């Protein structure tokens, strides 16, 4: 990290002296700045930062979602189910080897999945009933239920790690990694930087890989730069050629500058407002009060104030990039800002002037979002206080609806059914759903969408409409993701990952 600061300091001085875009060295290396570099290379990790763009570069998985949101085989050759998604037979490709020369077989796939179940770091592995080897290249996976997206999630979270290499590591791959990936991690400084180089002994022909992960760059250097202005300086001075998910306020400064290419994509989560379902909360059983709050929110003003105009409305509670989202919802009435309507609903509700509480994290944009919401609600005659808490408090209390009346959160997932299950399943926790609500009518609609035959447009619409009409949650806005690169690197044949963002390793360049 000290080395990086020294480089950035020199870059700042150079920028001050010359006041122009400095040329980046053409060394064949793609240098990328991102807000987080892993603190460990272990393949066993929780969901935090799971969607970081470098994970598909350092570890291959059994399957991968492409930009069309279709699951492609990767280490797996094929799979099939004969019982409607409860049990799968998965066949692996032949000849898979890790960078230490160890063969990756069904024994390793079974071991990795069993170890993931035991460590319980990702909830999806708790949905596995059993996993067993069939032969050297085949294993059987039995699920507790055939919920849509479960098998797909397991395939993308099960990595090409051999048991022999993992057990030979003194720190469980904390500081070095052996995997089946075409890239080897040749330099790693935890939470600072990571260098990846193409292996000469990779086990298969690169062109046979899924296009979204087939490498076109021989060497990639990831640098952690958390501070937005420093990320911008690194881009301008050629310390890096690309910055991914740079904060909007900094990223928009490069609009209209031909020296930089800007790509804006829909955020993969967005921000949501969840209403408490606990009986102690005034909002729990007061539909008109919840609807009044929704009508009091000026989404366009919120996007302008918080995302400088670089964002989009949410027409479901959750992000439009999730599988199952229907663009037709964008033509529906969904609590378009109407202050007079909000005031009318407040008068018709059971609200008696109580002070309602908003719980949010004290980090990032959350406190500002809460302040904007507070101002909107006060205009409608609703008193609000904000509890911007430490993350430890959020983790301990986010599911307890007695601790708040409203909770600001940002929920991800590959399928809409994922996000819906996380938040609205009345049987998910001992106290009910993610806000202590026990809405079993909604639960029955949810469960209809969980099975392969039930995941239909009609059933998905039923859940969407129920959430909209009941207003137990409300989609606030979805800020764009900014990815910016120096135009001189000559991006050609751009490849995208599932969320629509550039896949830097799989994209071709003429100017590195």
Label the predicted regions:
Residues 204-253, 383:
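Ligand-site clamp/hinge motif
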Residues 123-165, 171-172, 182-189:
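Surface-exposed binding/hinge segments that line
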Residues 105-111, 138-140, 181-182, 214-219, ...:
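Alpha-helical secondary-structure segments
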Residues 77-121, 134, 140, 283-285:
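Aromatic- and charge-enriched surface segment that lines or borders ligand/interaction sites
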Residues 183, 312-348, 365-366:
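Structural transition elements
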Residues 27-36, 77, 87-91, 109, ...:
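Short, well-ordered beta-strand elements
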Residues 189, 193, 296-325, 365-374, ...:
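Detector for C-terminal structural segments
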Residues 33-81, 114, 178:
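N-terminal lobe/hinge region of extracytoplasmic solute-binding protein
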């Amino acid at each position: 990290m000290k080395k990086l600061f020294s480089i950035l300091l020199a870059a700042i001085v150079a920028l001050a002296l010359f006041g122009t875009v400095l040329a980046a060295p053409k060394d064949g290396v793609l240098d990328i700045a991102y807000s987080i570099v892993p603190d460990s290379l272990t393949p066993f990790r929780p969901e935090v930062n799971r969607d970081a763009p470098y994970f598909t570069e350092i570890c291959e998985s059994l399957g991968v979602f492409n930009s069309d949101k279709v699951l492609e085989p990767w280490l797996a050759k094929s799979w099939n189910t004969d019982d409607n998604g409860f049990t799968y037979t998965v066949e692996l490709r032949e000849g898979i080897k890790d960078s230490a020369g160890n063969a990756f077989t069904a024994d390793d796939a079974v071991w990795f999945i069993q170890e993931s179940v035991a460590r319980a770091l990702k909830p999806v592995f708790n949905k596995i009933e059993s996993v067993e080897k069939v032969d050297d290249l085949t294993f059987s996976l039995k699920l507790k239920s055939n919920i849509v997206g479960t098998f797909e999630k397991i395939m993308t979270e099960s990595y090409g790690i051999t048991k022999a290499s993992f057990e030979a590591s003194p720190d469980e791959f904390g500081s070095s990694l052996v995997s089946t990936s075409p890239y080897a991690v040749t330099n790693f400084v935890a939470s600072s930087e990571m260098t990846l180089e193409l292996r000469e002994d990779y086990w298969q022909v690169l062109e046979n890989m899924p296009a979204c992960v087939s490498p076109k760059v021989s060497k990639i250097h990831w640098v952690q730069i958390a501070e937005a202005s420093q990320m911008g300086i690194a881009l301008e001075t050629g310390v890096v050629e690309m910055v991914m998910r740079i904060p909007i306020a900094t990223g928009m400064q490069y609009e209209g500058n031909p020296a930089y290419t800007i790509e804006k994509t829909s955020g993969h989560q967005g921000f949501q407002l969840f209403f408490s379902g606990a009986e102690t909360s005034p909002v729990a059983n007061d539909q008109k009060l919840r609807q009044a709050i929704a009508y009091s929110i000026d989404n366009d003003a919120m996007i302008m104030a918080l995302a400088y105009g670089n964002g989009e409305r949410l027409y479901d509670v959750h992000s439009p990039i999730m599988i199952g989202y229907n663009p037709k919802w964008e033509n529906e009435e969904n609590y378009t800002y109407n202050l007079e309507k909000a005031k009318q609903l407040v008068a018709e509700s059971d609200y008696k002037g109580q002070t309602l509480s908003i719980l949010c994290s004290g980090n990032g944009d959350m406190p500002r979002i809460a302040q904007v919401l507070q101002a909107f609600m006060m205009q409608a005659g609703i008193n609000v206080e904000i509890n911007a808490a430490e993350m430890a408090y959020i983790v301990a209390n986010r599911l307890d609806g007695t601790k708040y009346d409203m909770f600001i959160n940002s929920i991800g997932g590959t399928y809409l059914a994922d996000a819906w299950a996380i938040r609205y399943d009345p049987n998910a926790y001992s106290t009910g759903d993610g806000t202590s609500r026990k809405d079993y009518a909604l639960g029955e609609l949810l469960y209809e969408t969980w099975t392969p035959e039930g995941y239909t447009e009609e059933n998905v619409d039923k859940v969407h409409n129920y959430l909209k009409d009941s207003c137990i949650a409300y989609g606030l806005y979805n800020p764009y993701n900014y990815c910016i690169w120096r135009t001189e690197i000559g991006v050609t044949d751009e490849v995208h990952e599932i969320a629509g963002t550039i896949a830097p390793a799989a994209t071709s360049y003429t100017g590195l």
